[in-house]
Amino acid sequence: MKKTVTSWSFPHCDLKESVGLSKLLSINAIDIGYFYKSAIDKKTLLKDYSRIINDLQKFDIEYSNLYHLFGDTLGDRNLANKDSLDENSKDIETASKFCKELGIRSIFVLPGIINKNQSRKDAFIN
């Protein structure tokens, strides 16, 4: 069985610290994402992901998953909104290339569950 941990499991740790804790726990794979202190920079990933790859290759750990969010917030680019299709398609293509080059075999997609001017509570109810 393969064990992995999410970098955001340690929200106050940077990525180097998260990797260190993961290895201390004998977990040799870590998920990466765009939130908390361990975050990779999404704008950089979408613009020039080779810089992020160079930074990540410094750590002796496998990256098992990219936690990807469309847009900048949960309400920014909902997948159900066809007006976001072109931007979302471009972003997922770039994120996929990044993952392929780094050897990440899966992308966890957070699709944007909230529409503009809608609260999380309203989204859950409706």
State each model region's role.
Residues K2-S7, I30-I32, Y63-H68, I107-V109:
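Hydrophobic faces of well-ordered beta-strands that scaffold small-molecule active sites
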Residues T6-S7, I40-D41, D83-S84, A123:
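A generic structural signal for short
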Residues S7-C13:
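Short polar catalytic/cofactor-binding loops
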Residues F10, K43-T44, E87:
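Residues that cap or flank secondary-structure elements
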Residues L15-Y36, L102-G103:
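Catalytic domains of carbohydrate-active enzymes, especially glycoside hydrolases
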Residues E17, D55-F59, L74-N126:
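Active-site acidic/histidine proton-transfer and metal-coordination neighborhood
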Residues D31-Q57, P111-Q118:
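Glycine-rich, proline-tolerant flexible connector loops at the mouths of alpha/beta enzymes
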Residues D48-F70, I125-N126:
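Alpha-helix-loop-beta-strand connector modules within alpha/beta enzyme cores
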